[in-house]
């Protein structure tokens, strides 16, 4: 786990967990994850799940995406999605509130790869530069994404060539995030 993205993601995950502890909630909680199997689940009450990010051993990959669209993904994208299991984590980047997308389980990883593949196919059809989403904001047509060509983290308008660079790379983006605690 020496890759800068893996280290920055682990560091942010630790800050996220600490933010939950500091508010007296213990582990992060979610009603959306009830009944789902994952190595990061601490407790499933039937009404809500408590969870914590854990290192993924062995590290996963996104080979299904790369084979499916015949493209080599930027190493930062692979490291972002393959180094840990975690629920999505709420954060702020400057004034932008977002949910940092994560892989919750092996099954969730398969679903994620299908979604990424669909996203890349649509971009290819629209003749847009390839990106992979890593975060969602409160907007139906914008996502936080990694540009596959440059590794920059961008605020992207889906289906259009409208992109604002947020950070030069994923590690620096993650280092600038501030955890947000949202109660279920």
From Swiss-Prot:
It is a peripheral membrane protein. Pfam families: Syd (PF07348). The keyword Membrane applies. GO terms for cellular component: cytoplasmic side of plasma membrane. It is found in: Cell inner membrane. Coiled coil: none annotated. Its main location: membrane. Keywords: Cell inner membrane, Cell membrane, Membrane. Belongs to the Syd family. Interacts with the SecY protein in vivo. May bind preferentially to an uncomplexed state of SecY, thus functioning either as a chelating agent for excess SecY in the cell or as a regulatory factor that negatively controls the translocase function. This is Protein Syd.
């Amino acid at each position: 786990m020496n890759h800068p993205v893996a280290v920055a993601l682990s560091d942010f995950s630790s800050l996220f967990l600490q933010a939950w502890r500091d508010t007296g909630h213990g582990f992060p909680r979610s009603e959306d994850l009830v009944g789902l199997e994952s190595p990061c689940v601490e407790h499933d009450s039937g009404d809500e799940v408590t969870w914590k990010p854990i290192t993924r051993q062995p590290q996963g990959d996104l080979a299904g995406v790369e084979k499916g669209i015949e493209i080599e993904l930027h190493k930062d994208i692979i490291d972002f999605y393959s180094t840990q299991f975690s629920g999505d984590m709420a954060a702020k980047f400057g004034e932008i509130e977002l949910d940092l997308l994560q892989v919750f389980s092996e099954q969730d990883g398969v679903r994620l790869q299908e979604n990424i593949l669909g996203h890349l196919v649509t971009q290819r059809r629209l003749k847009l530069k390839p990106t992979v989403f890593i975060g969602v904001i409160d907007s139906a047509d914008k996502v936080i994404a990694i540009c596959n060509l440059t590794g920059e983290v961008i605020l992207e308008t889906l289906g259009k060539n409208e992109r604002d660079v947020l950070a030069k790379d994923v590690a620096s983006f993650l280092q600038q995030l501030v955890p947000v605690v949202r109660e279920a």
